Amino acid sequence: MSGRSRGRKSSRAKNRGKGRAKARVRPAPDDAPRDPDPSQYQSLGEDTQAAQVQAGAGWGGLEAAASAQLLRLGEEAACRLPLDCGLALRARAAGDHGQAAARPGPGKAASLSERLAADTVFVGTAGTVGRPKNAPRVGNRRGPAGKKAPETCSTAGRGPQVIAGGRQKKGAAGENTSVSAGEEKKEERDAGSGPPATEGSMDTLENVQLKLENMNAQADRAYLRLSRKFGQLRLQHLERRNHLIQNIPGFWGQAFQNHPQLASFLNSQEKEVLSYLNSLEVEELGLARLGYKIKFYFDRNPYFQNKVLIKEYGCGPSGQVVSRSTPIQWLPGHDLQSLSQGNPENNRSFFGWFSNHSSIESDKIVEIINEELWPNPLQFYLLSEGARVEKGKEKEGRQGPGKQPMETTQPGVSQSN
């Protein structure tokens, strides 16, 4: 045998010895702690993988020795179920499967992998399952004597469930407690609803009513302030409008005659008198509009001496509506009221309305002046004859046939068809 072949044999023997030395794992002694450090699992797997890599050069005795060593480790792990880690065995089995798939070997290695897989399943089912690295500890790991209790598959798998179940039971108990407390409170409220609750409601109602009265008083004061403010602004515009109207001769007389309803109260002489009307003012009595004061300003005319005629409406001491008017100082031979005393149409004349204080509740003229003529006299001044007749027909249609003026006949005078 040559020296080269001797060197090869010696190197193989050395490699075989190294592989055996690194692949051998000493079992843990009986007095070892019950909870091995997870770093030992990692170092054990790394040593086994290193041994397999170093033993990869030979396919003979080295593979068999490594397989035997792994089998012996599996048997020792099966004997020490509470002490070993099932996850480590699964990792070694997975490594063997991966190595076998990457590098197919003899049939003996494949059968060993199958045996390891079967042993691993058995160990994972009946043995212990080690806690993975950096995983949280579940439950109390120490026994009654203060020593660490072994973690079995049952305790590791059921530990969180038992704790969760305990919490659910605790939550259910808490729920029952809250429901019972709510029922007790409801019963107490039902039992306590009696005269004391009614008295409290009355006190609350009185407080709310008092607040409403205070709010209404504040609203009234605010309304009065706004009425004064905008009344002054409105008065400025009204004065400006009156000044402009005075520069238009016969403006108010024409507006009276063009109004479809006011024109029915005017005869030919009254239309002549109203032609001297140069200004009209409507003054509201009080901020609450409790009455009206209508002022008619006339130029010098051949009918009466008054420069202003006033018709006033207001509330009397007992609350009824009363009216007052200025006595008209008629010139001789031009007293329209005395000339029309025997005429039944006197009540439908303008000056008959001015001096009459009996039919106040059904006073139509003051309503027309306050609500239609005074707010916008320009629209009636600009009405033509055709537009005035058309507008009068529209108003009569809205009022209905019952409100149309009835024709009156003088006694002893018969009407002919």
From Swiss-Prot:
Biased segments, Basic and acidic residues type: 27-37, 182-191
Q: Which UniProt keywords are listed?
A: Growth regulation
The record's GO CC annotations read: chromatin; nucleus
Q: Which Pfam families match?
A: NAP (PF00956)
Q: Where is the composition biased (Polar residues)?
A: 406-417
Q: Per its UniProt entry, which superkingdom is the organism in?
A: Eukaryota
Q: Which GO terms describe its biological process?
A: cellular response to gamma radiation; nucleosome assembly; positive regulation of cell population proliferation; positive regulation of phosphatidylinositol 3-kinase/protein kinase B signal transduction; positive regulation of protein ubiquitination
Which named protein is this? Testis-specific Y-encoded-like protein 5
**Corresponding gene?**
TSPYL5
